[in-house]
Amino acid sequence: MLKPLFWPNLAWLGLLAALPAGAQDLSFTLTIRDHRFDPQELSVPAGKKFKLVVKNLDATAEEFESHDLKREKVIPGNSEGTLILGPLKAGTYSFVGEFHEKTAKGSIIAK
């Protein structure tokens, strides 16, 4: 016969297994519209790994590029891309849309 504490523990493990991978991770979204990033400044917690979803609402592709973060990713028009960033030290990290650098620019501020 199984001990009474076995079933609650088994149920708890089942709930943990049902969570999607990375459900505990932080997630932030940048939107590209009219060749501009929104928001232009994104605040994130320093010292934490996070997911950055870049949604491109324009019909043309844009390249998210950051020399500070050592990341670049082409986001096709009307689609989205995901980058895993961090953990970052406190500071400001600039990024641009390489295909429209005059208008598509911003920064991630780790606090």
Where on the chain are the PLM-derived regions?
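Bacterial N-terminal signal peptides that target proteins for export
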Residues: 1-11
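Asparagine-centered strand-capping/turn motif at beta-strand->loop junctions
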Residues: 54-56
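N-terminal signal peptide c-region/cleavage motif recognized by signal peptidases
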Residues: 18-20
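Beta-strand-rich interaction surfaces with strong enrichment in secreted/lumenal proteins
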Residues: 40-42, 70-74
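N-terminal edge beta-strand
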Residues: 24-47
